Amino acid sequence: MPNVVVIGAQWGDEGKGKVVDLLTEHAQVVVRFQGGNNAGHTLVVGGQKTVLHLIPSGILHPGKTCVIGNGVVVDPAVLVGEIDALKVRGFLKDDAQLLISDNAHVIFPWHKLLDSFREKARGGSAIGTTGRGIGPAYEDKVARRGIRVRDLLNADRLRTRIEARLPAALDELKDLCAQAGDPVPQLEVPQILAEFTGLGERLKPFVHDASLYLSGQVRRGARILFEGAQGTLLDVDHGTYPFVTSSNCVAGNAAVGSGLGPTAIDKVMGISKAYTTRVGGGPFPTELHDAIGDQLRKMGDEFGTTTGRPRRCGWLDGVVLRYASRVNGLWGMALTKLDVLSGLKTLQICTAYELDGQKVMELPGDYEDLARVKPIYETLQGWDEQIAGVRTFDELPENAKRYVRRVEEVSGVPVVCVSVGADRGETVLLQNPFRS
């Protein structure tokens, strides 16, 4: 049976949650393999809106198993809150539906404080972090001083590890607070230990060796869907560094972050909006600073799920999509929010860049070069029809069909899914990755 990775092909917020929710019908297991609660997936099912930050989107489907892999950094309080909220609404009736890797790393209060105060200290060169402690938690992981989910279940071990890490974190916080003129937050071992052992008890029924579970599912031929967070251009290695997140968002990390071998993955499906958005700092060649940009933001409800920050909006960037295809090995692409373009008289697609008088077809590796490029646009005619009721490709207005086909040509990736509204049902699935 094929196993499929769903990955963001832009700077995140592409609509991955909706596509994963749609494809979960055909999968048996859904895996989150990187990031933390800096990601937010918004799902609308039957007009009811659900926002998830850590638990995979497939949890809204009864009988599906959702896994939070070892590559995720977990804020236990946020996770417990999501579990409780889902149960109140009638989801997650069986605890066996959710597995948390015992090797996933944990976000502690000092991580969030360091994240916020470091960002404040950057001033005008701020990266745009969410302040959720994601980066500092990954930093501790790589420095081999991190605390994992398994440690929450052993109070003595947890105390030892908090005592080993907290003093250095407090020293840095004192320096940062002195620079900012702020009081130093009070962090003490007994309070942190009590809180996190309590959270560990709440999470204990869900904690497992996720790698062992998933390898067993692969052997049994289960269909597994890997749910990426953020997007390709936010990848710590392949994104617009340093304006990136702290994890690998590309498809290659799906195996590493879930504890499987790379041969377990069969197809990679990229997700792209019909236009482009970005949150926070960093280069954005097709960004619009005009009424059209404002219209895209308003009609697309482009405000961060996690932070509420307004997203920067611009035209679709074919150079970015070609790059995403290259580094992820895209089998196909879902084009989301096509309905947001309804009513625009003309549309533009960036097909290449101009850099220092030269035409550039590929994404520059240096973010300073990317900040200097000028987009080369191709203009297409728009459409006036509202398309939320469309359920087949042939029902789309002719100009909408031409737009989709041109996106395929510019990106080099077939469009296998088109989203025409926020609800799960407002989708045209042209090819099912689990069947074709």
From Swiss-Prot:
Annotated GO MF terms: adenylosuccinate synthase activity; GTP binding; magnesium ion binding
SUPFAM superfamilies assigned: P-loop containing nucleoside triphosphate hydrolases (SSF52540)
Location in or out of the cell: Cytoplasm
Keyword check for Cell membrane: no
List of residues binding Mg(2+): 13, 40
Binding-site residues for substrate, renumbered to this chain: 305-311
The protein, known as: Adenylosuccinate synthetase
Species name: Myxococcus xanthus (strain DK1622)
